[in-house]
């Protein structure tokens, strides 16, 4: 994907604030979810649109200060994701939460990375999305 400087910054911010800041693996997992959402008709079609969507990512994700000393994993992961790299265990998952959170709703968990648990929501396309990727509507 060819991304603008602003789109790259939005992706870096999502990775920085949502994953363990020292974890390339966690950053890749968050970046994979962001890109899965960008590619889905159910979410905004831009990285900044996805990351800035109300109550979907950390509060203030697009405005809070980042510590330059802790940005390296997110910067490297963002560049990898923008070149087509994806976390191999996240697959088509479009959702995650802190691994310590006890989700009261059914979910198909696919991996834990960077302090987050990544999952698919149940539904008629659950198995298809996990095995084949998101279905075309």
PLM feature spans:
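Bacterial extracytoplasmic/cell-wall-associated proteins, especially those involved in peptidoglycan
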Residues: 1-137
